[in-house]
A protein has these predicted regions:
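N-terminal helical cap/lid subdomain that shapes the substrate entry/recognition surface
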Residues: 66-153
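Short, acidic loop-to-helix structural element flanking the phosphoryl-transfer center
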Residues: 143-171, 178, 216
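Acidic, Mg2+-coordinating phosphoryl-transfer loop and its flanking beta/alpha structural elements
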Residues: 234-264
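Substrate-recognition "cap/lid" segment bordering the active-site pocket of phosphatases
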Residues: 150, 176-234, 241
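ATP-dependent carboxylate activation and anion-phosphoryl transfer catalytic cores
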Residues: 1-59
Length: 265
């Protein structure tokens, strides 16, 4: 006789116990054709059996009453927990201090942003000061600055409530690590979240875009750090196009914090 060994997913221990106890089990035909993920990170297969839609929330208090089975809540950052436009305005103040000779430069940068124009390039060209060297200096100063930003109303109270309910909190974000770390510190999230993961840090010297959402690897790493199954996790984001592809496929509960005043709305 020969033995066949199958490396299964997070439900393998449950399935093994059910078989040992002679309990009936439900199987899904052709599961590999629908909502199946194989991950080399955990060397496992995960089947998404969660059929719930993405839930739109209008107030952070809507997250006070999650299902009892949810042990961790993962949040996006930009335009989910704070206004990214506030960060951009904070960066414009840096440029204003650098270039006091440009009259009314802050308002001009804001106006270019609202028109969908590249603010720095537009304003510097209009002022007859455009150069690659000056652009680089401005961008370096922006990356190095401590942003003047604040959390949306209700975020601190929500985090306190989630911790009171013994639910862990994670922050999972794309973006330049130095910039995102500065935002996290300015918002005080480094003292409020249990785990923080910046996807670009996973790339090392490689292509950071490969690790950004909708890649599922950052979510699996977060799951491993928080030591909780994906089905017991919830994800909150603002970008309906890309934020929820991976967490939904992994079986997490998904909550959409629609932001009509977002930077990329």
């Amino acid at each position: 006789a020969s033995t066949v060994s199958i490396k299964a997913g997070a439900d393998a221990p449950y399935a093994a116990l059910s078989m040992m106890l002679g309990e009936p089990m439900e199987y899904k035909e052709d599961a590999a054709d629908d909502n199946v993920i194989f991950t080399r990170f955990e060397k496992s297969i995960c089947l998404n059996t969660r059929e719930e839609p993405i839930v739109e929330i209008h107030d952070f208090k809507d997250l006070y009453h999650l299902d009892e089975g949810i042990g961790s809540v993962i949040f996006d950052l930009d335009d989910t927990l704070y206004s990214e436009k506030d960060y951009v305005r904070s960066s414009f103040r840096v440029v204003e201090r650098m270039l006091p000779e440009v009259n009314n430069i802050f308002n001009k940068l804001c106006a270019a942003l609202e028109k969908g124009q590249p603010p720095l390039e537009t304003v510097l060209k209009d002022a007859g000061m455009h150069s690659d060297e000056l652009l680089l200096k401005c961008r370096e100063a922006i990356r190095d600055h401590k942003p003047e930003i604040s959390l949306y109303e209700g975020v601190k109270e929500l985090f306190f409530e989630l911790h009171t309910q013994k639910r862990s909190i994670g922050i999972l974000i794309d973006g330049t690590p130095k910039v995102q770390r500065a935002k996290i510190e300015a918002l005080g999230l480094d003292k409020m979240a249990d785990e923080i993961l910046i996807t670009d840090e996973l790339a090392g010297h490689g292509n950071v875009m490969e690790f950004r959402k909708p890649n599922d690897l950052p979510f699996l790493i977060m799951r491993k750090r928080l030591e909780i199954p994906c089905r017991n996790m919830a994800f909150v984001g603002d970008d309906i196009e890309k934020d929820f592809i991976a967490p939904k496929a992994l079986g997490m509960e998904c909550y959409w914090k629609k932001n009509e005043d977002g930077l990329y709305e």
